[in-house]
């Protein structure tokens, strides 16, 4: 089983995160950031990843450190759980609509961190959650998963729908990239021989 548990403690946050990449989409989330929990549940459900997160952060200041550090921890756990990347598809992509909103996410588990994020949210916050933190979450993830990630919210009028399509599409793209490629067997999906 491709699993990992990360404990990450700083002066700002204490996070314990477990991931099972071959799960069924179960999520047990206690982050202190309700909207983020709703989005993380989308990653688990649509990525068929079991995700357990307990986070204690300085949310009395704001949600920034907690959101960013959960992204970092998820990236670290994914990198550890995926291992040497032999036999995986490596690339994944997904378009996801939700009513008027549509997002596209493309991922490459390349070993090269990079985020291209384009989302013009129609509101600055969703129920107290700053929409700028969506990019912060994914920046933390890409840096520590060592993945290249392109996220485009192509349209939308409702900021909640915009964010939700991004997280759902991310889960589905990640699921595709992590799938076993029987034709690759124990080979790395790269002509370089290393990822």
UniProtKB/Swiss-Prot annotation:
Pathway(s) this gene product operates in, as recorded in its UniProt entry: Amino-acid biosynthesis; L-histidine biosynthesis; L-histidine from 5-phospho-alpha-D-ribose 1-diphosphate: step 6/9
Main location: cytoplasm
GO cellular component terms listed in the entry, alphabetical order: cytoplasm
A Pfam family assignment: IGPD
Gene Ontology molecular-function annotations: imidazoleglycerol-phosphate dehydratase activity
Alphabetical list of CDD domains matching this protein: IGPD
EC number from the UniProt entry: 4.2.1.19
Enzyme class name: lyase
GO biological process, alphabetically ordered: L-histidine biosynthetic process
Localization: Cytoplasm
Top-rank taxon: Bacteria
InterPro entries in alphabetical order: IGPD_sf, ImidazoleglycerolP_deHydtase, ImidazoleglycerP_deHydtase_CS, Ribosomal_Su5_D2-typ_SF
Catalytic activity: D-erythro-1-(imidazol-4-yl)glycerol 3-phosphate = 3-(imidazol-4-yl)-2-oxopropyl phosphate + H2O
Keywords: Amino-acid biosynthesis, Cytoplasm, Histidine biosynthesis, Lyase
HAMAP family the record matches: HisB
Protein family membership: Belongs to the imidazoleglycerol-phosphate dehydratase family.
NCBIfam families (alphabetical): PRK00951.1-1, PRK00951.1-5, PRK00951.2-1, PRK00951.2-4
Name by which UniProt lists this protein: Imidazoleglycerol-phosphate dehydratase
The species this protein was found in: Hydrogenovibrio crunogenus (strain DSM 25203 / XCL-2)
Lineage: Bacteria, Pseudomonadati, Pseudomonadota, Gammaproteobacteria, Thiotrichales
């Amino acid at each position: 089983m491709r699993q990992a548990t990360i404990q990450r403690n700083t002066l700002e946050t204490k996070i314990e995160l477990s991931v099972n990449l071959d799960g069924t989409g179960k999520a047990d989330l206690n982050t202190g950031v309700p909207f983020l929990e709703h989005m993380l549940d989308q990653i688990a459900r649509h990525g068929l990843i079991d995700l357990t997160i307990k986070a204690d952060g300085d949310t009395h200041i704001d949600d920034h450190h907690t959101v960013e550090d959960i992204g970092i921890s998820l990236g670290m756990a994914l990198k550890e759980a995926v291992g040497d990347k032999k036999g995986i598809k490596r690339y994944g992509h997904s378009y996801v609509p939700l009513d008027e909103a549509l997002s596209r996410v493309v991922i490459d588990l390349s070993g090269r961190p990079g985020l291209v994020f384009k989302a013009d949210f129609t509101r600055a916050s969703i129920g107290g959650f700053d929409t700028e933190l969506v990019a912060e979450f994914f920046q933390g993830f890409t840096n520590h998963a060592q993945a290249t990630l392109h996220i485009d919210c192509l349209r939308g009028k409702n900021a909640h729908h915009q964010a939700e399509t991004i997280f759902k599409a991310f889960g589905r793209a990640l699921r595709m990239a992590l799938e076993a490629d029987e034709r690759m067997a124990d080979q790395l999906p790269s002509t370089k021989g290393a990822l």
